[in-house]
From Swiss-Prot:
Organism of derivation: Cerberus rynchops
Major location category of this protein: secreted
Alphabetical list of PANTHER family matching this protein: FIBRINOGEN/TENASCIN/ANGIOPOEITIN, FICOLIN-3
Protein name as it appears in the record: Ryncolin-1
Residue span(s) of domain Collagen-like: 57-114
GO terms (BP aspect): complement activation, lectin pathway
Length: 345
């Protein structure tokens, strides 16, 4: 059926029914009951019949997108992932401050006895002096460790060349680089430089000369290169309580006359400890430290002058040598255990 034919059919039926309703309404008072018995919409005075669906229309134009919705709440935390590989180790940080010193630990067990010494330069504690070193094959001048007693190791200079070697040097002057006009405590402990001038120390000299007889040799050299020496049969000094009192034996021989034995029996004096027999302080008058009496014939710890000097007797003087107005360029004093035979040089 054509769409327009259906339209006309509906229109005719509707018009017919409307006429009936109107006639009944004018001819009596009986209510009008609907005559529709379909599931479609109806009223008391109209019946609308639905025809077949028409052809769908053309789709409309799509609408515009709506605005972005609000961000949702975070979801629940997921389970931990697997551990990743170790990263590259970073650079070391700066060194921290030194911590407090820890408590002292317990004393360890006593170690096993060591093996016998077989290394070069390894010397037994029986090496008491430079002569012992020479007998152990040490033939070079230099500083060595000796053991006058096992409890008292000592570093000393050994002259291994002069007069057969084995001499222990306890005093040396050679260039004026060290001040010898010092006090009692300095001479007690020792001072100076290993490579140049030094005084070994009265306490050490006492220890070295307190057992066995030690010969003494004094060597001098002037600024013209002339060398002289004097040798004595024995030499020792007392301890500090004895004021380091000098005990020197007989003059044996030498290329210069004796100017030292006259000091025998006298105490050691310094500028701050006057132990001489003079009314004044000989150490202060003659700018040294020595076994002064009233005052001296030798002053090997005096001021370092270069040869002749104007001041009286305050240089490195030797009365029977160059006298009181000439100071020597080089001086040393050294000891060696007494020997039955000695070689003079």
């Amino acid at each position: 059926m054509k769409p327009w034919a259906a339209f006309h059919l509906i229109f005719l039926v509707a018009s017919s029914l409307e006429g009936e309703v109107s006639n009944y309404g004018t001819g009596g008072t009986q209510d009008t009951e609907p005559t529709c018995r379909t599931e479609h919409q109806c009223t008391r005075d109209k019946i609308i019949l639905q025809s077949q669906p028409g052809i769908p229309g053309i789709p409309g134009v799509p609408g515009t997108n709506g605005s972005e919705g609000l961000k949702g709440d975070p979801g629940p935390q997921g389970p931990p992932g697997i551990r990743g590989p170790d990263g590259i180790r970073g650079e070391a940080g700066p060194k921290g401050d030194k911590g407090d010193q820890g408590d002292k630990g317990d004393k360890g067990d006593k170690g096993d006895k060591g093996e016998d010494c077989n290394l070069d330069g390894c010397l037994p504690t029986e090496v008491r002096n430079c002569q012992d070193l020479l007998e152990h094959g040490e033939i070079l001048n230099g500083w060595y460790t000796i053991y006058p007693t096992k409890e008292n190791p000592m570093v000393v200079f050994c002259d291994m060349e002069t007069d057969g070697g084995g001499w222990l040097v306890f005093q040396r002057r050679q260039d004026g680089s060290v001040d010898f006009y010092l006090d009692w405590e300095s001479y007690k402990k020792g001072f100076g430089k290993q490579e140049s001038e030094f005084w070994l120390g009265n306490d050490k000299i006492h220890l070295l000369t307190s057992s066995g007889t030690q010969q003494l040799r004094i060597d001098l050299e002037d600024f013209e290169g002339s060398r002289t020496f004097a040798k004595y049969s024995s030499f020792s000094i007392g301890d500090e309580n004895e004021k380091y009192r000098l005990i020197v034996g007989s003059y044996l021989d030498g290329s210069m006359n004796d100017s030292f034995r006259i000091h025998n029996g006298h105490s050691f004096s310094t500028k701050d400890r006057d132990n001489d027999t003079n009314k004044g302080n000989c150490a202060m008058m003659y700018k040294g430290a020595w076994w002064y009496f009233h005052c001296h014939h030798a002053n090997l710890n005096g001021l370092y002058y270069k040869g002749k000097h104007a001041n009286y007797a305050d240089g490195i003087n030797w009365r029977s040598g160059k006298g009181y107005y000439y100071s020597y360029k080089y001086a040393d004093m050294k000891i060696r255990p007494q020997q039955s035979e000695t070689t003079v040089s």
